[in-house]
């Protein structure tokens, strides 16, 4: 671990205290996990604390952990992952917060702390169904208003639920149930030891 990362780790532990659930270092990056009830206050500390000063929200996205890793995931299903940048100190941190309810995932909105979170949170809502409490305009951003479900959830069917087509009799685009038969895709398994090595 570099001196810079050691300083960042120490500053994070001191500033966040009990709000910090875990801190891991991998591939030269620090990832912290905070509880959903502490999310807003922890993010405000990350932005305002003099030893941290994470002024920029670089990215925010939703994650569905239902089939993460080699088997079934045993923790909460949905998380929001944010990437923050401190211009003052020239360091970065990844913040992960898990929604406490898998059926109705809700976390606090970051739009009051970083206005740039607006469209990121709308995208996470649109694709994963994660609700952001306090967001003043939480609506779909990339799928159409009649879209059913959230397409980045791992239990969403690959073919979707409805398809659009132009109806010449009605002279407009209409929705109809998907006409594709669902099937299970089996990954190709290559058993030859030296396959593709020649």
Swiss-Prot record:
SUPFAM superfamilies: Nqo5-like (SSF143243). It is a peripheral membrane protein. The keyword Mitochondrion does not apply. It catalyses: a quinone + NADH + 5 H(+)(in) = a quinol + NAD(+) + 4 H(+)(out). Its EC number is 7.1.1.-. It is an enzyme of class 7 (translocase). Keywords: Cell inner membrane, Cell membrane, Membrane, NAD, Quinone, Translocase, Transport, Ubiquinone. NDH-1 shuttles electrons from NADH, via FMN and iron-sulfur (Fe-S) centers, to quinones in the respiratory chain. The immediate electron acceptor for the enzyme in this species is believed to be ubiquinone. Couples the redox reaction to proton translocation (for every two electrons transferred, four hydrogen ions are translocated across the cytoplasmic membrane), and thus conserves the redox energy in a proton gradient. NDH-1 is composed of 14 different subunits. Subunits NuoB, C, D, E, F, and G constitute the peripheral sector of the complex. HAMAP family: NDH1_NuoC. Belongs to the complex I 30 kDa subunit family. This is NADH-quinone oxidoreductase subunit C. It comes from Herminiimonas arsenicoxydans. The lineage of its organism: Bacteria, Pseudomonadati, Pseudomonadota, Betaproteobacteria, Burkholderiales.
């Amino acid at each position: 671990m570099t001196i810079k990362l050691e300083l960042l780790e120490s500053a994070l532990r001191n500033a966040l205290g009990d709000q910090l659930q875990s801190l891991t270092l991998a591939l030269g990056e620090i990832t912290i996990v905070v509880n959903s009830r502490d999310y807003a206050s922890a993010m405000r500390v990350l932005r305002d604390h003099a030893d941290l000063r994470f002024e920029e929200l670089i990215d925010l996205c939703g994650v569905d952990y239902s089939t993460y890793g080699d088997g079934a995931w045993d923790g909460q299903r949905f998380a929001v992952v944010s990437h923050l940048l401190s211009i003052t100190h020239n360091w970065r941190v990844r913040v992960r917060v898990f929604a406490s309810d898998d059926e109705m995932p809700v976390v606090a909105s970051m739009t009051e702390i970083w206005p740039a979170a607006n469209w990121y949170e709308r995208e996470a809502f649109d694709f994963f169904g994660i609700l952001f409490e306090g967001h003043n305009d939480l609506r779909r951003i990339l799928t159409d208003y009649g879209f059913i479900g959230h397409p980045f959830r791992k239990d969403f069917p690959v073919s979707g639920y409805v398809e659009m087509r132009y109806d010449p009799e009605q002279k407009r685009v209409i929705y109809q149930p998907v006409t594709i038969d669902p099937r299970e895709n089996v990954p190709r398994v290559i058993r030859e030891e030296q396959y593709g090595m020649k």
